[in-house]
Amino acid sequence: MIRVLALVARNTRSAVGGKPMDPISMIRPCRKIRGISAILLPFQSNGDVDWAGFTAHVRRTVAAGLAPAVNMDTGYAHLIDDATRTRALELTQAETDDFVAGAFVGDQPGETFNADEYLRQMEIIQSAGGVPVIFQSHGLTAQSEESVVASYAQLAENADAIIGFELSDVFAPFGKIYSLDVYHGLLGIERLIGSKHSSLKREFEWQRLQLRDEVRPDFCVFTGNDLAIDMVMYGSDYLLGLSTFAPDVFAKRDAAWATG
């Protein structure tokens, strides 16, 4: 498997120095992994949210040692209303003070960046003690590269910490995988403490890890690649939907990696 990955990387240029990428040299054994697991929002047969099931799942995730992520795509962030989002936050806050939550702004192509709505969503999350994960939107990603970075900086000024989220447009029409120039700019925003990467392309994530290691080692690259959960070997942490099925198993994997 490692040999196959090396062949894949041969034609991929490094994010630092432009040399061919060598992912094998990036493997980081005995590293403590930061695991965040997106919580599924379950529904009953009558269409009501199964809040008892939701709470039990949050509790199970916390007991396993992972931080829950609520109101993400696994929690139908783009389909639920503010009342449902707020209830999910309240129930999560009752179980843990270590959690993140999606800040989603629904818009249409051609609309401008809606900073006010992002800030409103962020305030709801922060009031419950969570860290906002900034979902992309048409207004955010359609801007110039300089304006994209400036928008994240504006949001970060109004929070103790935020997490970014790159989403491939194969998943959502507003999604965008940023250029490495944009990513470099994001690394310069102090209160942007990490970013989830969901391109499903190892080489893109390897490039981000290299750039992170060079520019800002404390920045978290959260893999969102459910098809390559071994990206933690190379220095990624994770914010995954797949882990919602078995948070205890992911936690055991993480512990085994940390101890070698």
Provide a role label for each language-model segment:
Residues M1-L5, F99, S243:
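Short intrinsically disordered, low-complexity coil segments enriched in acidic
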Residues M1-P20:
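N-terminal amphipathic/basic-hydrophobic helices that include classical n-h-c signal peptides
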Residues D22-G175:
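Active-site beta->alpha loop and helix N-cap motifs at the rims of alpha/beta catalytic domains
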Residues D169-G260:
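Catalytic alpha/beta core domains of metabolic enzymes, predominantly
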